[in-house]
């Protein structure tokens, strides 16, 4: 029997096709698609609302407007399916065909397609070798073009004006062919032979060496090749038939009052039809040529406007003065088809409402309002009611639900039970912005959210809204439960630290209860165990804050009652600790066991033998963990757990060899030490982290929930509140301010005497006040801390809130009770005068005014930056969206070398933090004992960290995404650990999107930060000295030093250098980088203590130091030309500054130092002369003929004034790095190792020539340095490749060319990390590496060899290697390419998938280029698949794709 379903067309399975091809359509093809020609501009009859025949909505062409009903009403119902009505000609069929059927308009005269004309580079122009201007003159009927000159002396494709054409006709008659308009262009395109043209262009390319010409030829060749390969004929770019969109995609809706709402496209089509009909009529009437030409031009313009309004001439506007939306506009931009409808669909089974807090929920639950659940789960309820026999039809079920009888609510409870729902809070910046929960039905109209997931959602309860979505299919429910349930997402994917961490009130509660107060009831009592403490506390014998002693797990601890109460809620398990040795051969295992039985120490054997020798392999493990980790049988595990403490096991066979175990002892999974301290935010985070690492997921979730409960309980009992007395102003505040004012006055005097410049004064003053503010803040914290233990036993609540990390920050407290400090102007500069008052004392009018300045900036910043940050995230997601883990191991032999991130002598990130969770490339060995710490190919995990740190390793080779050899995607070994779960990454994980989210999410958070501090300037006090961090001896090494008049050593290395500190064993323990001009206050070999000052410098100027003694002589320093004497209006003192005013190019301001014989002195190295070129902006500190000593400063260069360092400076910097833009003041880097020589004379343009001559006598490199730039090197210096000749930010392309692509990648990773580090945000390196890998996927062709490539073409690295492999196999010459780095926007647009690129940016250009090349999109990325409506090839969709491929 047929079912109703059989009558309908079945939807095609979206996996049935393997790709999407796009190409330019010919007129024949458009006619094939069409269901009829539209000849009338009418739309619908306004009285009957029926479509007019042959009009834009014609039912005969497009199908009926009502299901199975013809236009005149003769045939109705489904029984006439497929009949065509003889009266009105309409087929009886579903009305939805009006969404699919196209029509066409036959044009009376061909027109050009504006995309192929105007989208740069112009496709028509490049095929014909005409400029856009020339083409437009022909197409818009301004000039004739010669098609075939035959025997005349006209040249082919020559443009003729109206007069010239008439003259030529008069002169030659019909001996030549010329035409005007699109017909002419079509005739020319028809004549083009692509094969011949392509060959000719390739020959021309080989023959020319002019760069501009080569570029132009390559561009033409690219377009001609695309046409040739795809089989698209260039003449199809001229349209003879315009396709018409199906009518339901450009609807016309009647409104009340007889008006209509219509899509703009209808107006645009109407204009085309009207003009086309008028042109037909004029041609039939044989109207004068000039009228017909005008009408043809108007038709061309009408079609242009239909395709892309505003591209040519002024945009056509509708009745309400806004431009009409053309076909291009419906695709483009955020509101276009791609982003609005294909990537951002709205979904059913969803709802949204306000959120409130649900403090009594468990972590996997959320409170769902009953009314909402009833609406969302309706179909399920109908089904369940029917099942239970309450109703028999859906209709009666509907009625029953509408009446809301009690049975309905019971049914709802059953349906909702254990059915996961997804909650989402916009903006969803990372994957934790959508999580699944089990709903608990509640009264009221707000969703209740568990407080611990607020961090992940970035939610608060000041009116935020959240959306609920219901996973419908069983698969979706499983995924929601297994992958998305809140309890399965405890760690942050960005850095692996827990993200489900108690905050705010909970922290306040735990902090309050774990603090001790002297003199509390029951102080000093000793208890035998935690149970006793709890009993005593319950009976009121001891107070919460009493300091007591307790025996826990056999050890006596000094602790407090509150801490024992916290310890009691922690899920505890006592587990055995095993030491173990792994052997691959049984023989070796037997001999070791025999030795141990003879009395040898197990630890010694562990270090000597086994595959992991050198690792003190000791683990506390549960039985099930032992079974899974070592591959033991149940029986073996039981045997091990029956051992006595200190006993050694027999040899146990496991999956990959043999093991010996020794039971070393027992311990609780979470040691009491973790709780035995005041539990602030940081301590609690460590506790949760430790719980996750040691006890696994389940216990951690229980712990988090219990901490939440106890935290809320005690923050309520503690009842902390703020009073004005709690804001203690430190007594020393005014002393510190007076001292600072005195220093500022000194600096003002120095400035008045002309010793320092305006810029230096500003910098120093800002520095003094920054330091004073910090000092006051520290004093204030101390004052409040001591206040916390006052005899009355009261805590200082403000201090507690900040110290525990529950609310507010040290910064905000400083403003309340310290001093507000320096404020920033909107430009980012810092105002010199600080606000010395705080909020408790109150601000004066002036102070208040200054502070509003900065606060407003904060607000404006926030608004602007959020958009910027969102855009950065979008570009990142786009470039990395097809990065998926596709295989286990790509077999790469390469990796990257990682060292600790050091800035200015400070370790910003330790080596172990950078390598954790990565795979070792080769064996990591202890540099002293040569023992293996980690085997090559093994993951560097937590247990290796202390060993690596103690071994003194400074560099480690690891596998990296940057060197992964996988053809598509990335392999698991090169990626390493998946931070969200703490184990090796799984196949199909979309690591690209993960990386984009991890980098983009903090960006948005950081922009919000200025908003909360309220405009006070945050600035690090500039470092001006190096202090030793450890005891040891100084080794100055190969620093170039000169002793100055004060007998101190001055560093003369122009590019800076470093000295080291070694410990007693001669091991290097610290590196101290110093800058040029720094004075070193210690001697070589001197014994130093931690905290000693080793070197100092002026942080605000770069000095120029004389290396020899003698007499000063000026060269080319002429007042008014190269030197300006400025009298300071404030001080009346004059200073001499080098300027660049002279119009002649051959002046080089310099200072020479003459010896006693009045010759230029020779430097200590005996080669170079003592000449010092002076850059623009240098301030002279000596006069001519002064006598100076070695080490004296002769001139100084002020550094830029400091602006506030915040993410505002940071986000644009991150964007600049990811877009690989050339920095404004780019550094000039040496490309080779060699010796410097600086030419005396300058070039014609006044540039200075610096030559680097290689040691081995190869080709020297020359660099032209612009006038007035400070050269970082001296004549005769040795310089390494990649070092700076002129300082500045490095241009990424230079770094790549000189030091290679891996070095560049490391450079980008470190630079991006620096920005985020400043803000205290941790992102793992691998996320940035994934993005950088995507930016480096292209190769620029340098030599084409025997391949099809074109010079300077950018091709995908994979395609490049494949093509070369083929060419070599056929005995040809491969192409040569150089690695290329593209910015993220360029890289996204250069992806192989045109669907992805078109939905990103420049839609028109991408589609135009793809359609002439006949590109196929094989749907490998995520975005293409979402747009095509398929499952994404990642995660659970990944395996399915693999299966499909294998079939």
Curated annotation (Swiss-Prot):
Cofactor(s) needed by this chain: Mg(2+); Zn(2+)
Residues that hold Zn(2+) 1 according to the record: 70, 72, 85, 88
Class of enzymatic activity (EC top level): transferase
Enzyme Commission number(s) of this protein: 2.7.7.6
GO cellular component, one term: DNA-directed RNA polymerase complex
Catalyzed reactions per annotation: RNA(n) + a ribonucleoside 5'-triphosphate = RNA(n+1) + diphosphate
Residues holding Mg(2+): 460, 462, 464
Cofactor note: Binds 1 Mg(2+) ion per subunit.
Annotated InterPro entries: DNA-dir_RpoC_beta_prime, DNA-dir_RpoC_beta_prime_bact, PPIase_dom_sf, RNA_pol_asu, RNA_pol_N, RNA_pol_Rpb1_1, RNA_pol_Rpb1_3, RNA_pol_Rpb1_3_sf
Keyword vocabulary terms for this entry: DNA-directed RNA polymerase, Magnesium, Metal-binding, Nucleotidyltransferase, Transcription, Transferase, Zinc
Residue sites binding Zn(2+) 2 per the record: 890, 964, 971, 974
Record keyword Nucleotidyltransferase present: yes
Family the entry assigns: Belongs to the RNA polymerase beta' chain family.
Subunit structure: The RNAP catalytic core consists of 2 alpha, 1 beta, 1 beta' and 1 omega subunit. When a sigma factor is associated with the core the holoenzyme is formed, which can initiate transcription.
Protein name from the UniProt record: DNA-directed RNA polymerase subunit beta'
Organism, as annotated: Desulfosudis oleivorans (strain DSM 6200 / JCM 39069 / Hxd3)
Lineage: Bacteria, Pseudomonadati, Thermodesulfobacteriota, Desulfobacteria, Desulfobacterales
């Amino acid at each position: 029997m047929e079912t109703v379903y059989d009558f309908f067309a079945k939807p095609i399975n979206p996996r049935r096709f393997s790709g999407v091809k796009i190409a330019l359509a010919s007129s024949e093809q458009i006619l094939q698609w069409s269901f009829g020609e539209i000849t009338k501009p009418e739309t619908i009859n306004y009285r009957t609302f029926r479509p007019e025949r042959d009009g834009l909505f014609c039912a005969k062409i497009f199908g009926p407007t009502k299901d199975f009903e013809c236009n005149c009403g003769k045939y109705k119902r489904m029984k006439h399916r497929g009949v065509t009505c003889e009266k009105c000609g309409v087929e009886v069929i579903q009305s939805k065909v009006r969404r699919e059927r196209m029509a066409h308009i036959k044009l009376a005269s061909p027109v050009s397609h504006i995309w192929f004309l105007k989208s740069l580079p112009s496709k028509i122009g490049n095929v014909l070798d005409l400029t856009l201007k020339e083409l437009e003159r022909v197409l818009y009927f301004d000039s004739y073009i010669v098609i075939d000159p035959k025997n005349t002396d006209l040249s082919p494709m020559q443009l003729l004006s109206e007069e010239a054409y008439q003259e030529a006709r008069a002169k030659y008659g019909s001996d030549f062919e010329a035409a005007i308009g699109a017909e002419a262009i079509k005739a020319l395109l028809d004549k083009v032979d692509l094969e011949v043209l392509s060959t000719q262009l390739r020959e021309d390319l080989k023959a020319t060496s002019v760069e501009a010409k080569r570029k132009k030829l390559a561009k033409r060749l690219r377009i001609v090749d695309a046409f040739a390969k795809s089989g698209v004929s260039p003449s199809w770019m001229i349209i003879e038939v315009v396709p018409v969109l199906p009518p339901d995609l450009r609807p016309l809706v009647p409104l009340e009052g007889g008006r209509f709402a219509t899509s703009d496209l209808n107006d645009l089509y109407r204009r085309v039809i009207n003009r086309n009909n008028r042109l037909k009529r004029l041609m039939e009437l044989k109207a004068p040529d000039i009228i017909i030409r005008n009408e043809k031009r108007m038709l061309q313009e009408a079609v242009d406007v239909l395709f892309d309004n505003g591209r040519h001439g002024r945009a056509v506007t509708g009745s309400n003065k806004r431009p009409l939306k053309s076909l291009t506009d419906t695709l483009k931009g955020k509101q276009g088809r791609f982003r609005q409808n294909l990537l951002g669909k709205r979904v059913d089974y969803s709802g949204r409402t306000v959120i409130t807090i649900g403090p009594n929920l468990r972590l996997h639950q959320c409170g769902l309002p009953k009314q909402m659940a009833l609406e969302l789960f309706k179909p399920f309820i109908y089904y369940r009611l029917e099942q239970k026999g309450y109703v028999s039809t859906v209709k009666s079920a509907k009625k029953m639900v509408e009446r809301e009888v009690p049975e309905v609510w019971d049914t709802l409870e059953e349906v909702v039970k254990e059915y996961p729902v997804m909650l989402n809070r916009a903006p969803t910046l990372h994957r934790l912005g959508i999580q699944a929960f089990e709903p608990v039905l509640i009264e009221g109209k707000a969703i209740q959210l568990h407080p611990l997931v607020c961090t992940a959602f970035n939610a608060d309860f000041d009116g935020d809204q959240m959306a609920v979505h219901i996973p419908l299919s069983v698969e979706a429910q499983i995924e929601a439960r297994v992958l998305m349930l809140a309890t399965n997402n405890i760690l942050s994917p960005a850095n692996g630290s827990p993200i489900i961490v108690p905050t705010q009130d909970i922290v306040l509660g735990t902090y309050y209860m774990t603090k001790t107060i002297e003199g509390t009831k029951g102080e000093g009592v000793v208890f035998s165990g935690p149970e006793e403490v709890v009993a005593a506390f319950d009976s009121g014998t001891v107070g919460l804050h009493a300091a007591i002693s307790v025996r826990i797990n056999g050890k006596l601890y000094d602790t407090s009652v509150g801490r024992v109460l916290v310890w009691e809620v922690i899920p505890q398990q006592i587990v055995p600790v095993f030491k173990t040795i792994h052997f691959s051969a049984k023989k070796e295992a037997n001999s070791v066991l025999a030795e141990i039985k003879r009395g040898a120490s197990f630890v010694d054997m562990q270090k000597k033998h086994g595959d992991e020798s050198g690792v003190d392999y000791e683990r506390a493990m549960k039985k099930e963990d032992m079974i899974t980790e070592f591959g033991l049988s149940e029986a073996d595990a039981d045997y091990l757990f029956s051992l006595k403490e200190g006993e050694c096991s027999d040899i146990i066979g496991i999956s990959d060899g043999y093991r010996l175990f020794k039971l070393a002892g027992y311990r609780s999974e979470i040691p009491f030490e973790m709780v035995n301290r005041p539990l602030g935010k940081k301590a609690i985070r460590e506790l949760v982290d430790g719980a996750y690492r040691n006890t696994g997921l389940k216990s951690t979730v229980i712990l988090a929930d219990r901490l939440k409960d106890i935290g809320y309980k005690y923050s309520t009992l503690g009842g902390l509140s703020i009073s004005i007395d709690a804001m203690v102003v430190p007594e020393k505040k005014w002393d510190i301010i007076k001292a600072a004012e005195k220093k500022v006055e000194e600096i003002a005097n120095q400035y008045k005497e002309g010793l320092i410049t305006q810029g230096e004064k500003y910098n120093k003053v800002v520095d003094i006040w920054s330091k004073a503010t910090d000092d006051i803040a520290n004093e204030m914290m101390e004052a409040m801390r001591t206040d916390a233990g006052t005899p009355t036993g009261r805590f200082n609540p403000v201090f507690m809130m900040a110290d525990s990390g529950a609310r507010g920050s040290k910064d905000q407290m400083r403003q309340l009770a310290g001093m507000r400090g320096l404020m920033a102007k909107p430009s980012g500069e810092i105002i010199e005068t600080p606000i010395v008052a705080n909020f408790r004392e109150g601000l004066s009018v002036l102070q208040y005014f200054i502070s509003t300045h900065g606060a407003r900036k904060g607000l404006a910043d926030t608004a602007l930056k959020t958009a910027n940050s969102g855009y950065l995230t979008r570009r990142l997601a786009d470039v990395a969206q097809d990065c998926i883990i596709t295989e286990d191991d790509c077999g790469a032999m390469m990796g990257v070398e990682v060292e600790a991130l050091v800035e200015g002598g400070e370790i910003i990130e330790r080596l172990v933090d950078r390598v954790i969770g990565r795979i070792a490339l080769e064996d990591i060995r202890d540099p002293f004992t040569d023992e293996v710490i980690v085997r090559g190919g093994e993951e560097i995990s937590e247990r290796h960290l202390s060993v690596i740190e103690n071994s003194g390793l400074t560099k480690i080779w690891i596998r990296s995404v940057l060197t992964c050899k996988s053809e598509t995607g990335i392999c698991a070994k090169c990626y390493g650990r998946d931070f969200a779960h703490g184990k090796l990454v799984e196949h199909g994980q979309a690591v690209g999107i993960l990386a984009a989210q991890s980098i983009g999410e903090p960006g948005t958070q950081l922009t919000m930060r200025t908003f909360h501090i309220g405009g006070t300037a945050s600035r690090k006090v500039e470092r001006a000295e190096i202090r030793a961090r450890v005891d040891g001896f100084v080794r100055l090494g190969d620093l170039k030093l000169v002793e100055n008049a004060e007998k101190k050593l001055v560093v003369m290395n122009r590019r800076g250098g470093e000295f080291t500190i070694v410990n007693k064993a001669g091991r290097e323990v610290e590196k101290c980088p110093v800058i040029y001009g720094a004075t070193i206050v210690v001697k070589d070999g001197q014994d130093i203590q931690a905290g000693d000052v080793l070197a100092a410098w002026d942080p605000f100027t770069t000095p120029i130091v004389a290396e020899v003694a003698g007499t000063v002589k000026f060269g080319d320093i002429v007042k008014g030309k190269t030197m300006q004497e400025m009298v300071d209006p404030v001080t009346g003192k004059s200073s001499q500054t080098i300027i660049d005013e002279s119009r002649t190019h051959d002046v080089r301001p310099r200072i020479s130092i003459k010896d006693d014989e009045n010759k230029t002195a020779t430097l200590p190295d005996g080669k170079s002369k003592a000449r010092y070129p002076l850059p623009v902006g240098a301030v002279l500190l000596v006069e001519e003929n002064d006598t100076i000593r070695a080490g004296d400063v002769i001139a100084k260069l002020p550094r830029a004034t400091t602006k506030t360092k915040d993410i505002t400076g940071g986000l644009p910097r991150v964007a600049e790095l990811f877009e690989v833009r050339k920095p404004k003041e780019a550094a000039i880097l040496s490309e080779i190792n060699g010796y410097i020589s600086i030419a005396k004379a300058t070039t014609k343009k006044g540039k200075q020539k610096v030559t680097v001559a290689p040691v081995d006598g190869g080709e020297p490199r020359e660099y032209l340095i612009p006038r007035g730039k400070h050269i970082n090197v001296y004549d005769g210096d040795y310089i390494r490749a990649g070092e700076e000749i002129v300082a500045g930010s490095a241009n990424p392309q230079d770094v790549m060319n000189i030091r290679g692509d891996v070095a560049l990648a490391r450079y980008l990773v470190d630079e991006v990390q620096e920005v985020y580090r400043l803000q205290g945000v941790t992102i793992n390196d691998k996320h940035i590496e994934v993005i950088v890998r995507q930016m480096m996927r292209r190769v620029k062709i340098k030599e084409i060899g025997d391949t099809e490539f074109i010079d300077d073409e950018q091709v995908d690295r994979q395609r490049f290697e494949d093509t070369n492999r083929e060419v070599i196999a056929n005995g040809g010459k491969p192409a040569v390419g150089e690695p290329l780095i593209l910015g993220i926007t360029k890289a996204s647009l250069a992806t192989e998938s045109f669907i992805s690129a078109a939905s990103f940016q420049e839609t028109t250009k991408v589609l135009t280029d793809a359609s002439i090349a006949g590109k196929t999109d094989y749907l490998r990325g995520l975005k293409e698949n979402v747009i095509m409506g398929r499952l994404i090839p990642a995660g659970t969709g990944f395996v399915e794709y693999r299966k499909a491929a294998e079939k």
